[in-house]
From Swiss-Prot:
InterPro entries: APS_kinase, P-loop_NTPase
Listed GO biological process terms: hydrogen sulfide biosynthetic process; sulfate assimilation
Upper lineage: Bacteria, Pseudomonadati, Pseudomonadota, Gammaproteobacteria, Enterobacterales
Name by which UniProt lists this protein: Adenylyl-sulfate kinase
Keyword Zinc in record: no
Amino acid sequence: MALHDENVVWHPHPVTVTAREQLHGHRGVVLWFTGLSGSGKSTVAGALEEALHHRSVSTYLLDGDNVRHGLCRNLGFSDADRKENIRRVGEVASLMADAGLIVLTAFISPHRAERQLVQERVGHDRFIEIYVDTPLAVCEQRDPKGLYKKARAGELRNFTGIDGIYEAPESPQIHLNGEQLVTNLVSQLLDLLRRRDIISS
């Protein structure tokens, strides 16, 4: 569909975002986890979602591998496809936040420009960038999917951190040390959500 198609008109919803948030008892936001492969994004995001669920918070976790089984199954790993992957996820995350959910996303999302586009789509007041900062050497040592080994052997091209660029966030809302215990990182994130009045104390 062309961006300028005059026959496509936005249909307003009778139920507002505020009304949905009141029903859930908390704000709808997007928590965007970014970092190298093996940094711990999915692990920390999953642990945080579990902690929020136990507090009766409505959540959904969008994981980089999982969306490629459906929503983004037709995309590869070229620069263009990776950009489209993040665009699609950003659109879905924005809709879920409109529904009043706390949306957790775990994607390498190596380029600042793409993360900025998602932030603009979601809204600056509903987007929290979370940088899981783990040294490359530690990520390689973890290598849960064996991808670094393949990249070092030349079997994977344009792999982020090896021969593909990763642009670290310049001013994330929270900067996590990926070598800390997951429980410590979850505590830091819960504190952030309380300070932002996203969840109750």
